[in-house]
Amino acid sequence: MTLWRPTPSDIWQGRDDRAEASNALRIFQTLRQSEHFIPANSGIALMGFASDEGVKRNHGRTGAAQAPDVLRKALANMASHHGHDRLVDMGTFTVEADQLEAAQHALSDGVQACQQAGMRTLVFGGGHETAWAHGRGVLEAFPDDRVVIINLDAHLDLRNAERATSGTPFRQLAQYCAARQREFQYACFGVSRAGNTQALWDEAGRLNVTLVEDLHFRRDALSTLDAVLAQADRVYLTLDLDVLPAGEMPAVSAPAALGIPALDLLPVIEQICRSGKLQAADLVEFNPLYDREGQGARLAARLAWQIAHWWA
């Protein structure tokens, strides 16, 4: 498969505690690695999308292309509990030069193949351009189902641009659905009115996007989520790490001045994971160039750890 590489074996390393007990295991010891892109009929396919071309096109801070393996390393040494032995590392899709669209197509095909084989997909971006590819792959895999997109994000990412960027994925997914006379079901939780122009707010209204603003997150998120999940056959969850406060997550292209603390996000993530409807999830916009002593990587990896643990 072009634009794809297996994950180097030295990425998955950590402390070995098996001398204490046979079940004293960590992620690096229970995760399976695939040397070839051959989807299984079950499990969680962990994939990377090493891209910041979309961030570059959107005039953001580049560096997210390095994120997938940094996040793998941060996850590797965490304890392995229920659900983590389902993880299968299916490698990373890469962008050659500025050929973002080709890489997005490759990731989309890979996601579709995994989903149709019986796997669910967990993708480490990369910028939020990851979502156009990941979301399209899920929609292609389930053409007759109501796939609801839930975005935990300070930004709507409904920009109108000549080329795909990290700011356009949900407009692209809306256009994809419209071309197929398919309902576009999109909810954005944690969105910042200060971080989105009136034009973007108007576009969200035109597309009937469900919104929970950052200021009202604690009050409204869980009740709104109940209504969103009731409309879904399957859910694609995309977590833009810039939804977190800059103090918790400095390592993103656009750090949040306000943001939603991780302890407030986690009940929402848990409810989605335990709904039985979660089909796909990703974490995007992590930029290791701006991390502080690995703080952001560890938090992002912990969020991924929780998703895999809670995923029903």
From Swiss-Prot:
One of its GO terms (biological process) is L-histidine catabolic process to glutamate and formate. GO terms for molecular function: agmatinase activity; formimidoylglutamase activity; manganese ion binding. Keywords: Histidine metabolism, Hydrolase, Manganese, Metal-binding. It comes from Enterobacter sp. (strain 638). Binds 2 manganese ions per subunit. Catalyzes the conversion of N-formimidoyl-L-glutamate to L-glutamate and formamide. Pathway: Amino-acid degradation; L-histidine degradation into L-glutamate; L-glutamate from N-formimidoyl-L-glutamate (hydrolase route): step 1/1. Mn(2+) 2 binds at D153, H155, D240, D242. It holds the Pfam family Arginase. Belongs to the arginase family. The lineage of its organism: Bacteria, Pseudomonadati, Pseudomonadota, Gammaproteobacteria, Enterobacterales. This is Formimidoylglutamase. InterPro entries: HutG, Ureohydrolase, Ureohydrolase_dom_sf, Ureohydrolase_Mn_BS. NCBIfam families: hutG. It catalyses: N-formimidoyl-L-glutamate + H2O = formamide + L-glutamate. Its EC number is 3.5.3.8. Its cofactor is Mn(2+). Mn(2+) 1 binds at H128, D153, D157, D240.
